[in-house]
Amino acid sequence: MRNVPVVARGDQFVFGQNLEDVAEFVGLQGGTGHTPLPPEQLIGKWLNVLRTAQRYLRQMPDARLNELVIDNRPRSIRLMGHHVFRIGEAYLETAVDGVEYATQLANVPPKDGTFTTGEEIARYGDTVIARLEKWWKELPDKSCQQKVKTFFGMQPLHLLYERSTWHSAQHTRQLAAVLERFNITPDKPLTKEDLAGLPLPERLWE
């Protein structure tokens, strides 16, 4: 069963993944009030986030990669680091290959015995960054209004693009918090300006 938020009213419902759909469903005039960043700004922010995650992972002690990110979540630092970049790969599978986007698509874990060092995970990031750069350079319609198939219906590519960007950013913020817990100062941390315009959760561990 998919773990997906749903807003229901009688026998009607809407998936909670698209907050504008939710706002319309409940009759909120003017929607959420959030204006997504233009696609040409998102690519720069996303690539900066991924490069920041690479720096953080290269700082992470390899001997601690299998520790939990936080005590009450069953995800190791290794899996979190891999996930930051897997989000980008999953996005491309939908945007380029036409695979239906689903939550589990971005949660495909690395095989046992792989990605055992921060450096190895960071190098995986190199391949994802290169693919994203190539995708953007070759994208014919940079408005990103073309529709893609997701588990919550056909959606504009722009929505999934923005979602994937802030999703990577949120986990990168969490990696910085892990470094700080280890008394390691994050290398060139993300700034408020880097994250401006992204609809990030208010709390770090949401």
What does each model-identified segment do?
Residues D21-E24, L28-Y91:
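Non-globular targeting/processing and membrane-anchoring segments
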Residues N66-K111, K147-E206:
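Short, contiguous alpha-helical
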